[in-house]
């Protein structure tokens, strides 16, 4: 008899059932692993699968996480180059793609990443036809559109991490300026993740007190306190971090785990994430932009109708036109 047989008496033969709350992360670069560790620390899954094309790196990352199992509450961590390891996932997070180079605009990355998605998405769909897709790779709004087109999924099941991070950065910087924790500082960045994002100044508040009502010049050129700079810092922050350390990882990893928590626990929290906005705010093309969305187990169920100033709406439409200009040129 083996030690196991001497130690344990089996009382019930378990049917081999698959995981119920499985999450897959595609791409084990800095962003993918930051997403993985953030998700593991929040105990969101009963199985975590990692996929990448670089097999040594992939196995190394898996082993490194498995060796920390004692300190985690996720019983199964698996990995593979073959997408069969992703089978029965509830949520699939796509972080794979060509990395943004210093000074390179997010939009420049597009076609390089479309070609990668043409391989990834059909494989994900094959093994998890009922999953939700969360796209993180940049340029995220265009690649969310690409994932939606290739997958054939309904639009509520394909989301982009979008402005969830931009809004978090905004709230952090707002908190630094006011000496208040970012949880108590409210403000929304919508539109394109990145260079043409739109700050909704009318909604910026602390404890329901509108900063714009207190100080009408907020966010305008006449603003002596330079609040407009806060938004500029949000836009520049990724470029600054890339310049300093070569890539961004921790903040986006935490932001993605925040979205994963809302989905896996069906919290129905409102997040500024990338969704199909055709028919909203005068947008007439098939583009994905960030607007406040009610998110849960089924994906996006509702969109909050924000009251925007005409110039804010104009900026959104301009973003949509820019994105559509690029999307219509893409080779699928």
Swiss-Prot record:
The protein's job, in short, is:
Interconverts simultaneously and stereospecifically pyruvate and lactate with concomitant interconversion of NADH and NAD(+).
Recorded hits in SUPFAM superfamilies, A to Z, give:
LDH C-terminal domain-like, NAD(P)-binding Rossmann-fold domains
Q: Which GO terms describe its cellular component?
A: cytoplasm
Which InterPro entries does this entry report, sorted A to Z? L-lactate/malate_DH (IPR001557), L-lactate_DH (IPR011304), L-lactate_DH_AS (IPR018177), Lactate/malate_DH_C (IPR022383), Lactate/malate_DH_N (IPR001236), Lactate_DH/Glyco_Ohase_4_C (IPR015955), NAD(P)-bd_dom_sf (IPR036291)
Active site: residue positions: 193
Q: What NCBIfam families does the record point to?
A: L-LDH-NAD (TIGR01771), PRK00066.1 (NF000824)
**Which organism was this protein described from?**
Pelodiscus sinensis japonicus (Chinese soft-shelled turtle)
Q: Which GO terms describe its molecular function?
A: L-lactate dehydrogenase activity
**Family matches, as CDD domains:** LDH_1 (cd05293)
Coiled-coil spans are: none
Taking the first listed entry, what is the main subcellular location of this protein, grouped into a coarse class?
Answer: cytoplasm
Instruction: Reply yes or no: does the keyword Lipid biosynthesis apply.
Output: no
Pathway named in the protein's UniProt entry: Fermentation; pyruvate fermentation to lactate; (S)-lactate from pyruvate: step 1/1
Give the catalytic activity: (S)-lactate + NAD(+) = pyruvate + NADH + H(+)
Q: How does it assemble?
A: Homotetramer.
UniProt binding sites for NAD(+): 29-57, 99, 138
Q: What Pfam families would the database entry show? A: Ldh_1_C, Ldh_1_N
Sequence positions that bind substrate: 106, 138, 169, 248
Q: What class of enzyme is it?
A: oxidoreductase
Name its GO BP terms in alphabetical order. lactate metabolic process
**Alphabetized Gene3D superfamilies for the sequence:** Lactate dehydrogenase/glycoside hydrolase, family 4, C-terminal, NAD(P)-binding Rossmann-like Domain
- Write out the annotated subcellular location: Cytoplasm
Q: Its family?
A: Belongs to the LDH/MDH superfamily. LDH family.
Keywords (A to Z) from UniProt: Cytoplasm, NAD, Oxidoreductase
Listed EC numbers: 1.1.1.27
Read off the HAMAP family from this record.
Answer: Lactate_dehydrog (MF_00488)
- In Swiss-Prot or TrEMBL terms, this protein is called L-lactate dehydrogenase A chain
């Amino acid at each position: 008899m083996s030690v196991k047989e001497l130690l344990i008496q089996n009382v019930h033969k378990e049917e081999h059932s698959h995981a119920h709350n499985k999450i897959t992360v595609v791409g084990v670069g800095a962003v993918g692993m930051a997403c993985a560790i953030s998700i593991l620390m929040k105990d969101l899954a009963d199985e975590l699968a990692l996929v990448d094309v670089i097999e040594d790196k992939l196995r190394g990352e898996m082993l490194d996480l498995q060796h920390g199992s004692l300190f985690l509450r996720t019983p199964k961590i698996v990995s593979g180059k073959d997408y069969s390891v992703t089978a029965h996932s509830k949520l699939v997070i796509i972080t794979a793609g060509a990395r943004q180079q210093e000074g390179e605009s997010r939009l420049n990355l597009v076609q390089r990443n479309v070609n990668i998605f043409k391989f990834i998405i059909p494989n994900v769909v094959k093994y998890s036809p009922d999953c939700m897709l969360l796209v993180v790779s940049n340029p995220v709004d265009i690649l969310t559109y690409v994932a939606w087109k290739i997958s054939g999924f309904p639009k509520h099941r394909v989301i982009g991490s979008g402005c969830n991070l931009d809004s978090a950065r905004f709230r952090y910087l707002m908190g630094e300026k006011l000496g208040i924790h970012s949880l108590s500082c409210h403000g929304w960045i919508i539109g394109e993740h990145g260079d043409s994002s739109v700050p909704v100044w009318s909604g910026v508040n602390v404890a329901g007190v509108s900063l714009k009502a207190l100080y009408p010049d907020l966010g305008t050129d006449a603003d002596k306190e330079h609040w407009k700079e806060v938004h500029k810092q949000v836009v520049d922050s990724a470029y600054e971090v890339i310049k300093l350390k070569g890539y961004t990882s921790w903040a986006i990893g935490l932001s993605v785990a925040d979205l994963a928590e809302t989905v896996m626990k069906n919290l129905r929290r409102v997040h500024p994430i990338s969704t199909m906005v055709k028919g909203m705010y005068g947008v007439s093309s098939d583009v994905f932009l960030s607007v406040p969305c009610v998110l849960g187990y089924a994906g996006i169920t509702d969109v909050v109708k924000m009251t925007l100033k005409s110039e804010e709406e104009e900026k959104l439409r301009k973003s949509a036109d820019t994105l559509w200009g690029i999307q219509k040129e893409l080779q699928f």
